Amino acid sequence: RLEYGVDGTWTIVDYKTGVIPSHNHVRAGVRNQLAVEALIAAEGGFSDLPPGPVAALEYWQISGRGSAPGDIKSRLDGTFDAASKRQYLENLAAEYDNPQCGYPSEPDPSLVPSFKPYEHLSRSREWRSGADYED
């Protein structure tokens, strides 16, 4: 959800039915969805909507076990720095664009959820098991 305030600032909202990303994960760039949307809004990338500063990145809990429905968690410290976020995302894209770059299915095992609905697409079980894997 994109909210453009009367003061000319943006609030970027994600409705969550599951776990809300931690403040540390958002700040460290591990969870980038709202930051990408904020960058687009700040730079005027949404058609027919003006650019402007981002005042808030919020996750609204609408159901789930982690938080009570209705909880709103802000994930922005101070002001949104569009220039540094753009640089971070461009560096990240360049790293993935490098043909010499590997693409691990689980780059940080501490961040892997217990439920992995797309694990079969990464073939990670096959790689862990070696050549004798059969499904």
Report each predicted region and the residues it spans.
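RecB-family 4Fe-4S metal-dependent nuclease core
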Residues: 1-135
